[in-house]
C-alpha cells in the first residue's frame, strides 16, 4: 500500500498537468498568436457563412466550378475521418484502372491536351485542397462555357489566387480550389 499511494498521486498530478493545464496553455497561446489557424483556417463566403477550411479539400463536380484533386478517402469523398492514401503503386492494376476512368471523365468533360497529374491522382492524405495552376488552366474552357465568362477573366482569377512557393523555394505554386470557386461565385454567381 505504501508504494501504491505515490503512484496514484503521480497519476493524478500528471493527468491534471498533461490532460488539463498543458492543453489549456497551448490552446490559449495558439488562440492569441494564430487565431485563424487555431480555429481551423475557416473560409467564409460573401455572406459571412463558414463554408469550409483552407486545409481540407471539398468536392466540386458541376461544370460551373473548378474541380479539385480526386479524393482518396473511402466511403464518400473528402471525408477527414478516413484520411489516408490508397498505398497503391503506379503499376497496381486497380490504381491504373481508377486513373484511366478519371482521365476518361475529364476527356468527356471537354478537357483536351495534356492532363496534369493532380487532376487524376489523389494526394497522400486524400484531402488536398490545392491544385496546380496548370490543373486550373486546363479547366478554363469548361468553366467559361458553363458560366458564360471569357477565358481571360478566368485566367486573371487563377493568377490572383495562385499561391507562390513557401519561403520562395518550398513546394510548388498552387491554388486553393475552395477559395477560387468562392471568388468565382462572387464574380459571377
Curated annotation (Swiss-Prot):
InterPro entries per the record?
A: KdpC
Q: Determine if ATP-binding is one of this entry's keywords.
A: yes
**Entry GO CC:** plasma membrane
Q: Which Pfam families match?
A: KdpC (PF02669)
Q: Does the keyword Ribonucleoprotein apply?
A: no
Top-rank taxon of the source lineage equals Bacteria
Q: What does this protein do?
A: Part of the high-affinity ATP-driven potassium transport (or Kdp) system, which catalyzes the hydrolysis of ATP coupled with the electrogenic transport of potassium into the cytoplasm. This subunit acts as a catalytic chaperone that increases the ATP-binding affinity of the ATP-hydrolyzing subunit KdpB by the formation of a transient KdpB/KdpC/ATP ternary complex.
Q: How does it assemble?
A: The system is composed of three essential subunits: KdpA, KdpB and KdpC.
Name the UniProt record assigns to this protein: Potassium-transporting ATPase KdpC subunit
Amino acid at each position: 500500500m505504501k508504494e501504491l499511494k505515490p503512484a496514484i498521486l503521480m497519476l493524478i498530478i500528471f493527468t491534471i498537468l498533461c490532460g488539463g493545464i498543458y492543453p489549456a496553455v497551448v490552446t490559449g497561446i495558439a488562440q492569441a498568436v494564430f487565431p485563424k489557424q487555431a480555429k481551423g483556417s475557416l473560409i467564409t463566403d460573401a455572406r459571412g457563412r463558414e463554408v469550409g477550411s483552407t486545409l481540407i479539400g471539398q468536392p466540386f463536380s458541376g461544370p460551373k466550378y473548378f474541380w479539385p484533386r480526386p479524393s482518396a478517402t473511402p466511403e464518400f469523398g473528402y471525408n477527414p475521418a478516413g484520411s489516408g492514401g490508397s498505398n497503391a503503386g503506379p503499376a497496381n492494376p486497380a490504381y491504373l484502372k481508377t486513373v484511366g476512368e478519371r482521365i476518361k471523365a475529364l476527356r468527356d468533360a471537354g478537357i483536351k491536351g495534356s492532363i496534369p497529374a493532380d487532376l487524376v491522382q489523389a494526394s497522400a492524405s486524400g484531402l488536398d485542397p490545392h491544385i496546380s495552376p496548370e490543373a486550373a488552366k486546363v479547366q478554363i474552357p469548361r468553366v467559361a462555357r458553363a458560366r458564360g465568362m471569357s477565358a481571360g477573366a478566368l485566367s486573371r482569377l487563377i493568377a490572383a489566387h495562385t499561391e507562390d512557393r513557401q519561403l520562395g523555394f518550398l513546394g510548388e505554386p498552387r491554388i486553393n480550389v475552395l477559395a477560387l470557386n468562392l471568388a468565382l461565385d462572387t464574380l459571377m454567381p
